[in-house]
């Protein structure tokens, strides 16, 4: 059985766009760079050729990864999400119980997480601690930097 990869429509669209770019723009550019480097003669000491081949290997590896991710994607329509319990797609407002610092996070797929933008991976310690909880609940997050306690203030959708 193939594991589905949950993600938002926005995250899925970004993966599709990167895949299109790598296949239709980056791949031809690298092939051209390899051909140009080959034209310079001796390949054994041709740094341009080796750099282009390395770029090709990296690009093709990422293309394979993106094809796999998009094939296994489970796109979750956040406009149809609701309820008081926290699950994938929820935007959660928390207060750090030690510092009273307020944080707002949206729970998203692994590929679209960006902590600076307030998007955390569903598999992160804090998201795992929040799943199934509601506003008013307290959670304890055990992370590599130590343990932190938060109170959930609000759960929003969309």
UniProtKB/Swiss-Prot annotation:
The keyword DNA-binding applies. SUPFAM superfamilies: FKBP-like (SSF54534), GreA transcript cleavage protein, N-terminal domain (SSF46557). Keywords: DNA-binding, Transcription, Transcription regulation. Disulfide bonds: none annotated. Belongs to the GreA/GreB family. One of its GO terms (molecular function) is DNA binding. The keyword Transferase does not apply. This is Transcription elongation factor GreA.
